[in-house]
Design a protein with these regions (language model features):
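Catalytic histidine-centered segment of alpha/beta-hydrolase-like enzymes
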Residues: 325-345
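Conserved acidic catalytic loop of the alpha/beta-hydrolase fold
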Residues: 142-166
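Conserved alpha/beta-hydrolase catalytic His-Asp/Glu region
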Residues: 206-207, 226-285
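Conserved serine/cysteine hydrolase catalytic core
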Residues: 269-308
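Flexible "cap/lid" loop of the alpha/beta hydrolase fold
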Residues: 185, 194-224
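Conserved alpha/beta-hydrolase
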Residues: 110-129
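Active-site glycine-rich loops that stabilize anionic/oxyanionic intermediates
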Residues: 91-94
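Alpha/beta-hydrolase fold catalytic core
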Residues: 1-86, 111-114, 336, 351-352, ...
């Protein structure tokens, strides 16, 4: 069979392939070092990517809709011949699994999309080389540069000679949502990229939460150097994770607790401090294809301060959704039936927003920019 998307040969080199959590979807997982070893990603390019981000490795998965199990020899063309990709970017102490059914729901809603869920910024299986990385290596602007480089590495943008229009749709939560504000529109073509920020922890105008993240990050970082304080951590950890994952499913709560335990304390502490001390206002005022969703009971992202910041950034009011819910407004927990009902509705809104953004971007590419 002729591979029309030979630049995406890495798709065939999955570590594992399985049925997805959502019916009629499939998932394949990838590790950059494994793809380099197999010759499916050029070794020098892969190593340059890791070196620029200070990472030991990079881990991701893809989710696609299918009514049957596509044979391996057809997989590259199947994943390449689409209208776009949805890149899911988790928050602190998260990993690519915190999204649960959301990637599958999106690709089932718009079957010309493929979802890519990543581990990033030192979490999951994308660990930093340095167990206590410098803050400028793990703050939102640095994470956005890594995302941009990753997209270029796996070549999912429209390549020279391709006839189809493609859109890259970013979806970020918490730290991942803040990351999306630092996208450089100069690196993208007209209508090529969209952004959906869920509970973005962008704290430029929120002094109380800045202090919270900075202090928490400093405290966790100290545990890396003074293990004797782990007794204190046993009392702090349950409270912190109750706050972070309030309203989320038990699975998400367990994932965060396990990820916290598995991640070097220096990495977790640095990621938190980087959000707390961030003072970078170099944010392009280009929000036509960006949406923000905020939860009214989010203890980690202050609603009033975030709305003030969005106003200062001249973010369009019509592109903001405030929904009844917590920091994890898209995860359906079992704490109360009312909370589960509200989060279920918010999750449906997230799916609709992602698909609508994608379709608007496609329309913009086909029509072209208006001049004059």
């Amino acid at each position: 069979m002729i591979e029309r998307y030979s630049h995406m040969r890495w798709v065939s080199g999955y570590l594992e392939r399985r049925a997805g959590d959502v019916p009629n979807t499939y998932v394949a997982e990838y590790q950059l070092s494994d793809l380099m070893r197999k010759g499916l990603i050029e070794r020098n390019a892969g190593q340059d990517f890791l070196n620029s981000a200070g990472l030991l490795d990079f881990h991701w998965s893809i989710t696609w809709p299918e009514d049957f199990d596509v044979p391996d020899e057809m997989l590259v063309n199947r994943i390449g011949d689409v209208a776009g990709y949805v890149v899911f970017v988790h928050g602190w102490t998260g990993n690519m699994h915190i999204w649960e059914e959301l990637p599958g729901m999106v690709v089932n809603k718009q079957r010309q999309l493929v979802a890519i869920s990543i581990d990033h910024n030192g979490f999951g299986k994308s660990l930093f080389e340095d167990k206590t990385p410098p803050l400028q290596s793990c703050n939102p602007p640095a994470a956005m540069r890594t995302l941009q480089n990753f997209i270029e590495l796996i070549k999912i943008r429209r390549q020279r000679g391709e006839t189809r229009t493609k859109v890259i749709n970013f979806v970020g939560h918490s730290m991942g949502g803040a990351t999306l504000f630092y996208m450089n529109p100069m690196l993208w073509n007209y209508g090529e990229v969209t952004r959906m920020a869920l509970a973005p922890a962008l704290l430029l105008e929120d002094e109380s939460h800045r202090v919270f993240y900075t202090t928490l990050g400093l405290g966790i970082g100290i545990l890396q150097r003074l293990p004797v304080l782990e007794l204190v951590e046993r009392f702090i950890k349950p409270s912190v994770f109750r706050t972070l994952t309030a309203g989320a499913s038990d699975r998400v709560k367990d994932l965060h607790a396990a990820q916290y335990s598995d991640t070097p304390k220096g990495i977790t502490g640095a990621a938190l401090m980087a959000m707390g001390v961030l003072n970078d206002y170099e944010i392009a005022r280009d929000f036509t294809l960006m949406r923000v969703m905020l939860g009214h009971r989010d203890p980690l992202v202050g609603l009033v301060n975030m709305m003030d910041l969005l106003g200062d950034l001249e973010f369009p009011a019509k592109n903001i959704h405030v929904v009844p819910g917590t920091h994890y407004m898209f995860s359906i927990g079992s704490e109360t039936p009312a909370n589960a009902y509200l989060h279920a509705q918010a999750r449906e809104m997230v799916v609709e927003d992602i698909v609508n953004l994608h379709e608007e971007a496609m329309r913009m590419q086909k029509v072209g920019p208006r001049i004059g």
